[in-house]
Every structure is written in structure tokens, then in C-alpha cells.
A protein has these predicted regions:
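A short glycine-rich, Lys/Arg-flanked "PGG" loop and its adjoining helix->strand segment in the class I
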Residues: 162-177
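Conserved SAM-binding strand-loop segment of SAM-dependent methyltransferases
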Residues: 124-138
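Short alpha-helix
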Residues: 206-221
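N-terminal auxiliary segments of SAM/dcSAM-dependent transferases
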Residues: 1-44
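Conserved alpha-helix/loop element of class I SAM-dependent methyltransferases that forms part
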Residues: 34-79, 93, 97
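Short, glycine-/aromatic-enriched active-site segment of Class I SAM-dependent methyltransferases
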Residues: 186-205
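Conserved SAM/SAH-binding beta-strand->alpha-helix loop
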Residues: 110-112
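A short acidic, Gly/Pro-enriched loop at the edge of an enzyme's catalytic core
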Residues: 76, 137-148
Length: 251
């Protein structure tokens, strides 16, 4: 469980997510009970060029559960959407890859994270990355905006995951790619005692699904070539692990 202090409580899972990740944005030096920062990203296979190009401030609030960039190349000139972008580490990497002629939209429900992501992108020299506060279920972007949608440890935090995937499908262009890292639940391990409260929802525990369930939801949303690409070993509880998923919008 997180080490978020006692004022980080709420009866609503979404509000609990906002409170916890505001705390992470404002106090990244605190111990939250799960791995974060540059060394965690290195463990997950992030390229050394990216790790060195971005300052420690960009990485300090990054709680990556996997490496979505390992699932396929992001090309120069493309448009990428990062849902649940947090402090913007992945969005900054995407901005590196798409270059000045590309575009990156970072979406997060936490105003403190959006502000920090904007500061990080500006300080890193990525004007092509812009950030907006919004819910994953109501992305403020037109149909067919993106060549790729990435996400890292965020979709499990949504209560209505079907609605999230429908929105992702909507904003992708035909042939667009979904490349995500997220937390999943091991079906063979019983739930931890901590897994029933909203705090563990914000800690990427209670909202997790089994991999097969999530794959079925991707197919239901209309995606093809749906694939569980592997597990990352990231843990938020004894019965969860990071996983990598990819899929294509047909067309």
C-alpha cells in the first residue's frame, strides 16, 4: 500500500487517484510503496539515450510499470496521445521520437501532474508536446487524431475501462496502434487483504483485471491483432504484475 499521508483519503476511487497522484507530483521524494524514478525506468528497459536526455526532475514523479515503446516504433512526424501521462516522462520520449514535425498530446485527470508535465516538456525543449486535464473516458480530441496511443499504469485506475478503450479506439486513425503497459492480476493468487479499499485502487491493485479479461475488452472495443506481449515484473501487490499489451485499429 502507499505511504500517502492521512489526508489522502476519499470514498471515491477517482478522487483517491487524484489525491495520491497530486501527492506524487508535489512530493516525489516520499516513499509510496512502489518503484518510481529513473532507475525503475532503466530496470524496465528504457533506452539509455532517453534516460540521459531527460533531467532527473522529469523522472522523479514517473511510476512506469513497463515500457510501451518496446511494443513498436514511434515514427518522426507522427501524432501520439499519452493517456494518464502523469508528469510527462513518456510524453517527452514520444516528443523526441516524433520530432518537431510531430505532435504529442498528454492527458491526465490530475491538475498537478498536468502542470508538472507541461513544465517538464518546456524545460526539455519539446514544444510539440501539449498537456490537458481530462478524464480517459472523455478525451478532448477529435476522431482519428492519433497514429499511436500509449499509456503506462493508468487504464487500471479507470472504473469504466470499456469506455476508456472506446475513446482510445475513437481517437486513433485507421491502422493506428495501441501500445500500453499496465498492471494485471494473477488469477492463481488470492487477493491481498488490502485490495478492497479505494487506497489500493489508487495504488494500481483493486482496479486490475486478469490479462485474458483485458484482451477480451480490447477485442470488444473493435481492436484487432490484440496481443499480450509479456510481463514486466513490476509489482504493486503480491498478486499483481506489470504487463505489455498492443493492438491495432483496423483500416
Amino acid at each position: 500500500m502507499s505511504k500517502c499521508d492521512n489526508n489522502c483519503t476519499s470514498d471515491n476511487p477517482l478522487e483517491q487517484v487524484r489525491l495520491l497522484y497530486t501527492e506524487l507530483a508535489q512530493h516525489p521524494e516520499k516513499e509510496f510503496g512502489w518503484a518510481k524514478g529513473k532507475e525503475n525506468a532503466r530496470t524496465l528497459g528504457y533506452d539509455e539515450e532517453w534516460l540521459n536526455r531527460l533531467s532527473d526532475i522529469v523522472w522523479e514523479s514517473a511510476a512506469a510499470v513497463g515500457n510501451p515503446f518496446s511494443l513498436g516504433p514511434i515514427q518522426a512526424g507522427e501524432t501520439v496521445i499519452d493517456i494518464g501521462c502523469g508528469a510527462g516522462a513518456d510524453a517527452c520520449i514520444a516528443a523526441m521520437l516524433v520530432g518537431k514535425k510531430g505532435k504529442v498530446f498528454g492527458i491526465d485527470c490530475t491538475s498537478a501532474m498536468v502542470a508538472k508535465a507541461s513544465e517538464n516538456a518546456n524545460a526539455s525543449g519539446f514544444p510539440q508536446a501539449v498537456f490537458q486535464e481530462a478524464e480517459m473516458t472523455e478525451l478532448p480530441l477529435p476522431d482519428g487524431t492519433a497514429d499511436a496511443v500509449i499509456s503506462n499504469g493508468a487504464i487500471n485506475l479507470a472504473e469504466d475501462k470499456d469506455a476508456v478503450l472506446e475513446e482510445v479506439f475513437r481517437v486513433l486513425r485507421p491502422g493506428g496502434r495501441l501500445q500500453i503497459a499496465d498492471m494485471v492480476r494473477h488469477p492463481s493468487i488470492e487477493n491481498d487483504a488490502c485490495c478492497s479499499g479505494e487506497e489500493s485502487w489508487a495504488d494500481c491493485v483493486s482496479g486490475t483485471l486478469e490479462s485474458d479479461t483485458f484482451l477480451s475488452m480490447l477485442s470488444k472495443a473493435g481492436f484487432v491483432d490484440v496481443e499480450l506481449a509479456g510481463y514486466t515484473g513490476y509489482r504493486t501487490a503480491t498478486n499483481t504484475t506489470g504487463a505489455l499489451f498492443k493492438a491495432i485499429k483496423p483500416g
